[in-house]
Amino acid sequence: VCGFDGEIEIVEHDGKLIWRCPKCGNMIFPRINPSVIVAVTHGDYLLLTKYANRPGAQRTALVAGFTEFAESFEQTVHREVMEEVGLKVKDLRYYRCQPWGISGNIMMGYWCRLDGDDDTIHLDNFELADGAWVSREELRENYTGNGIALTSEMIAEFAAGRDPYSLEKNK
């Protein structure tokens, strides 16, 4: 929204979409906030979390977070998983991305495996209210996603055995 007049419209400028104020002509070049969403697997289990101190905290989530300056997406995956649930991961696989329009976020979806046998979750209680390993079978029986968000899609793919590690195993 224009800081001068409080209005905005989306227009094309030199082949790019920008925000422009129809009153004063002020042009705003929105920035993109890259982030990751991470499906951490451990055999037939998927790590699910719930956000703390946020509206909708009852909803199921995957580990997620923003990429920091000079950090690769893969480094973000390792850092966010360690910060939020205290686990090391390996075998990262890029899945796909999902833009979140007005907020300027773009989420890069990744699959990864737990590195090692210690699956003890150490929650960052500031960001998360809960974290648990949920079996593929339990997800098949009980999970109903919204069908829109990348989180929902990745959980459904895991439940159906279409995550990259299950597909490798079944070749």
Segments predicted by a language model, with ranges:
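Hydrophobic alpha-helical positions that pack around
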Residues: 63, 77, 81
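Nudix hydrolase/Nudix homology domain
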Residues: 9-14, 55-60, 124-171
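Cys/His-rich microdomains that often coordinate metals
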Residues: 4-9, 28
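N-terminal strand-loop-strand
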Residues: 16-62, 66-67, 88-89, 93, ...
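Active-site-adjacent beta-strand/loop module that shapes the phosphate/pyrophosphate-binding cleft
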Residues: 98-122
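Short, cysteine/histidine-rich loop/knuckle motifs that typically chelate Zn2+
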Residues: 1-4, 22-23
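Glycine-rich phosphate/ribose-binding loops and adjacent secondary-structure elements
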Residues: 69-73
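Accessory, usually C-terminal, subdomains that scaffold auxiliary metal cofactors
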Residues: 57, 83, 96-97, 117, ...
